[in-house]
């Protein structure tokens, strides 16, 4: 948890870290995978170790929550809140979340508890940090579900889209055609195309 990600080059170079960048006030100008973007106050962006990030301008207050998959034991968690979940593999573009007042208050509460937990030196600290991280991820996952309009009965359909992007990350060097990914998912290319259209991807 840091409010000075831009001032620590080692964090920027670490390719094992998942990140949430949360602009709490003002703006933050970033370059994500060679695309410049300006985040506004209140926005939260989840990023994977594959993203290349450069902070171009800080004009406010922001917080970066960083973790690696070993800390979170991520692959043992439910798919939707894992590193292969909706936040990190929900679509081809960077997910920008805009929490409402209630969710913003929840994120502030979680961030405050995370900061407080870092100050405690005991054997329970690591587990408490994991629990708080999961709360942060679940809160952001709910925001992403609303953004992608994933209705309660439609999770399975959207899960196919998520699995597609996980496979693309794994096999993009050797597999270039949608048909190849459709085969891996045991679906037809037309089914995938219809799902992408349904979710505006």
Predicted segments — roles?
Residues 1-40:
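Generic protein-terminus/edge-of-domain signal
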Residues 19-22, 106-110, 132, 136-139:
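Amphipathic, well-ordered alpha-helical segments in soluble domains
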Residues 29-31, 47, 52-58:
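Short beta-strand His + acidic residue motifs that chelate non-heme Fe in jelly-roll/DSBH
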Residues 39-52, 66-69:
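Conserved metal-binding segment of the jelly-roll/cupin
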Residues 56-116:
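A hydrophobic/aromatic-rich effector-binding and dimerization subdomain
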Residues 98-101, 121-128, 140-166, 170-185, ...:
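Short, Lys/Arg-enriched, Trp-marked, Pro/Gly-tolerant hinge/linker segments that flank
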Residues 192-196:
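Short hydrophobic/aromatic patch on the recognition helix
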């Amino acid at each position: 948890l840091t409010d000075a990600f831009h001032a620590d080059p080692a964090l920027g170079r670490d390719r094992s870290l998942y990140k949430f960048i949360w602009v709490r006030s003002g703006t933050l100008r970033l370059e994500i995978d060679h695309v410049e973007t300006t985040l506004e106050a209140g926005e939260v962006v989840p990023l994977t170790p594959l993203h290349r990030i450069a902070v171009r301008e800080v004009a406010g207050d922001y917080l970066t929550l960083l973790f690696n998959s070993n800390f979170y034991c991520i692959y043992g968690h439910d798919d939707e809140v894992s590193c292969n979940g909706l936040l990190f593999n929900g679509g081809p573009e960077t997910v920008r979340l805009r929490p409402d007042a209630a969710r913003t208050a929840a994120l502030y509460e979680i961030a405050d508890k995370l900061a407080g937990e870092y100050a405690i030196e005991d054997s329970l600290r690591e587990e408490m940090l994991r629990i708080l991280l999961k709360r942060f991820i679940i809160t952001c996952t709910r925001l992403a579900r609303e953004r992608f309009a994933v209705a309660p009965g439609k999770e399975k359909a959207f899960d196919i889209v998520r699995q597609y992007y996980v496979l693309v990350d794994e096999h993009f060097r050797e597999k270039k055609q949608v048909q190849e990914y459709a085969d891996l998912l045991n679906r037809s290319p037309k089914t995938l195309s219809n799902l992408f259209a349904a979710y505006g991807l």
